[in-house]
Amino acid sequence: MTMLLDGGPQFPGLGVGSFGAPRHHEMPNREPAGMGLNPFGDSTHAAAAAAAAAAFKLSPATAHDLSSGQSSAFTPQGSGYANALGHHHHHHHHHHASQVPTYGGAASAAFNSTRDFLFRQRGSGLSEAASGGGQHGLFAGSASSLHAPAGIPEPPSYLLFPGLHEQGAGHPSPTGHVDNNQVHLGLRGELFGRADPYRPVASPRTDPYAASAQFPNYSPMNMNMGVNVAAHHGPGAFFRYMRQPIKQELSCKWIEEAQLSRPKKSCDRTFSTMHELVTHVTMEHVGGPEQNNHVCYWEECPREGKSFKAKYKLVNHIRVHTGEKPFPCPFPGCGKIFARSENLKIHKRTHTGEKPFKCEFEGCDRRFANSSDRKKHMHVHTSDKPYICKVCDKSYTHPSSLRKHMKVHESQGSDSSPAASSGYESSTPPAIASANSKDTTKTPSAVQTSTSHNPGLPPNFNEWYV
């Protein structure tokens, strides 16, 4: 894209303005359009020239606009920015290749002003598609789709962003028009500051989300960005690099015992949802009420053909293989799910505070949420101490008491604990224990110093405990 700085009076639909006298085709009663920060323009020529310090032109000058010694910076014969950027357009004649643009005799002055870049709209309204398929617009609408003043021919415009211009014919624009087989996605009111260069009329912002109602295949984000998606890429081509969701595939590994082949093959049917897999296993493999043999034939099942007494128990067991957990916790924010309804019932008591299991020992008022906790508590009232320490043979009524006791052995050395005979490994490495037994004259500080410099031993002796 070629950027041209112009300090002279601007004419909509014409080419590059310049300093100097008005051109020969200027209409006598027309005031120059105000282009500066004043959106309403000025009636004097001096104010218009000062306001139009710079302009950002998106279309080249026409042959009618340029004099015999001038050429446009957008044409390939220009030796300025156009040739430096390598722009080549087939719309111009090759016999101007040696000409140098003069820009109205003030080429150097036209590039002296480097401030106040403004977007200007050449005109308002829509025109029919110009002949020759080389006209393209900025993202959606072409620059030539806007009317120029009466009596001045339409200039061709060029592609600014290749790759985004391909659009299949027949798609209406959000405003109900099709220009150059391209959909206009609301850029006309957003890109330019004024809707009409001749009257002080504000250009309302178009709603990009309103266009999505007319285009169900385009998302609101596509409409807002004004991107034309190529017809052969489909509506989602703009987001084709986004990661697609991974499709879940669940396989049935049930092995039918009626197979005659060896080795027997599993079902291997795949399903996209857990509901489909469970329905398939229940209906086709487990069977109905007429089935008397409730055996799990899932591949590598640890039960190895052992039968269940009831069908519901087999169904609950199959959830171990399928991973189904159909019982979620109904309390907000919990998020836990369970495979068995009994486990959900017990879990819900943690939210409600219900403790239906009372201690059966007379005089004890302790209550518990589940029967297993009550059973552990009952050992307090009886002489039964089933939790025995393997190091010192002490027994406890509750497993938590045994865990607290084991921390005592972790802090002791191998000299005072018969760890080797009890099945527990010593918390002190054998090398340290042998060194302490051989050299009894050293103080504990000396032993600590000698062991701290051994690079082959970890500083934390608890790592040796299993």
Curated annotation (Swiss-Prot):
InterPro entries: GLI-like, Znf-C2H2_ZIC1-5/GLI1-3-like, Znf_C2H2_sf, Znf_C2H2_type, Znf_ZIC. It is found in: Nucleus; Cytoplasm. GO terms for molecular function: DNA-binding transcription activator activity, RNA polymerase II-specific; DNA-binding transcription factor activity; RNA polymerase II cis-regulatory region sequence-specific DNA binding; RNA polymerase II transcription regulatory region sequence-specific DNA binding; sequence-specific DNA binding; transcription coactivator activity; zinc ion binding. The keyword Transcription regulation applies. Residues 411-427 have a biased composition (Low complexity). One of its GO terms (cellular component) is cytoplasm. Residues 86-97 have a biased composition (Basic residues). Keywords: Activator, Cytoplasm, Developmental protein, Differentiation, DNA-binding, Isopeptide bond, Metal-binding, Neurogenesis, Nucleus, Repeat, Transcription, Transcription regulation, Ubl conjugation, Zinc, Zinc-finger. GO terms for biological process: anterior/posterior pattern specification; atrial cardiac muscle tissue development; axial mesoderm development; central nervous system segmentation; cranial skeletal system development; determination of digestive tract left/right asymmetry; determination of left/right asymmetry in nervous system; determination of left/right symmetry. Residues 65-103, 403-466 are annotated as: Disordered. The C2H2-type 3, 4 and 5 zinc finger domains are necessary for transcription activation. Interacts with KPNA1 and KPNA6. Interacts (via C2H2-type domains 3, 4 and 5) with GLI3; the interaction enhances its transcriptional activity. Interacts (via the C2H2-type domains 3, 4 and 5) with MDFIC (via the C2H2-type domains 3, 4 and 5); the interaction reduces its transcriptional activity. Acts as a transcriptional activator. Required in the earliest stages in both axial midline development and left-right (LR) asymmetry specification. Binds to the minimal GLI-consensus sequence 5'-GGGTGGTC-3'. This is Zinc finger protein ZIC 3. It comes from Mus musculus. The lineage of its organism: Eukaryota, Metazoa, Chordata, Craniata, Vertebrata. The gene is Zic3.
